[in-house]
Design a protein with these regions (language model features):
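Conserved "right-hand" nucleotidyltransferase catalytic core of DNA-directed polymerases
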Residues: 1-4, 9-175, 263, 270-274
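Helical catalytic core of nucleic-acid polymerases
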Residues: 7-12, 134-274
Length: 274
């Protein structure tokens, strides 16, 4: 993209008109390229819009998720979803699940720090990570891990690990990690009642089934709903706003990873990055 070569109010001579002509053609060419690039996303939004009687073409993934959950709650359960009213100084704690347990004293101490931590909302409605958690440097073997709103991160510098006849490197991912945590712990925005969980479970199960059967359109549509809804749990402007759910999910995800890392380490394996 390029800037307009002359002020829009300027009277142009013939040579300047030709420059504007080239500018317009450049705009058109790039618009066509952008349209082709976005075509799958546009088609997906049109199809989803038909299913939910809504024009979703200009909406982000998170906005689409919000519309769909609002529609499902109203159509299936008669619930009119409104934004919750939560005080700016709202404070809450993370609830440690029964299945989170550590073998080493170091990680048991980390768990107690997290159990005691108080989460608060800023005046803008953003969840603040407690300093006691932000300052944690969790050393397992030669790697240091930190916890944050965005997940668990290892702090290694540049490294090179070759695979050879003695060492194998494995890279594993978890399907629908956060959604499974939400479902397994029975989490839901309190103002939307447990009916939210019923709809959420249906979306996750339908998406996995579509992915398994090769139905890409349905799988991609429902992926938008799942991923988009999680982003809205932290937005004070959303009907899905639920700071407790957001923290319960993200902190649980990090603790489960630390449990896995600890067990692999105790079994004699090396964690390259997390």
């Amino acid at each position: 993209m390029v800037r307009l070569p002359y002020p829009f109010y300027e009277e142009l001579d013939n040579s300047q008109k030709y420059e504007v002509f080239k500018y317009c053609w450049n705009d058109l060419d790039n618009t066509i390229i952008l349209r082709k690039f976005l075509e799958p996303d546009i088609k997906l939004r049109i199809e989803m819009g038909r299913n939910y009687s809504a024009d979703l073409r200009s909406k982000s993934d998170a906005q689409i998720a919000e519309v769909i959950f609002a529609r499902e709650l109203k159509w299936k359960h008669g619930i009119i979803a409104d934004r919750p009213t939560i005080a700016p100084d709202y404070m809450f704690k993370y609830t440690v699940p029964d299945d989170v347990k550590f073998e080493t004293k170091q990680l048991q101490d980390v768990l107690e720090v997290i159990r005691a931590a108080e989460f608060r909302l800023s005046e803008a409605g953003v969840v603040q990570m407690p300093d006691s958690i932000k300052s944690l440097n969790i050393k397992i073997a030669d790697t240091i891990y930190t916890m944050g709103m965005g997940g668990l991160h290892s702090t290694e510098s540049w490294m090179h690990y070759p695979e050879d006849t003695e060492y194998l490197i494995f890279d594993r991912d978890v399907a629908s990690y956060y959604p499974r945590i939400i479902l397994n712990q029975g989490l839901y925005p309190k103002h939307l009642t447990k009916h939210f969980l019923t709809i959420y479970n249906s979306v996750v199960e339908r998406r996995l089934a579509a992915k398994e059967s090769g139905d890409k359109l349905t799988a991609n549509s429902l992926k938008i709903v799942i991923n988009g809804s999680f982003g809205k749990f932290g937005s004070v402007y959303s009907i899905l706003f639920s700071p407790d759910l957001l923290i319960q999910t993200t902190i649980s995800g990090q603790l489960y990873l630390l449990m896995l890392i600890e067990r692999l380490h105790l079994a004699g394996m090396t964690i390259i990055s997390g």
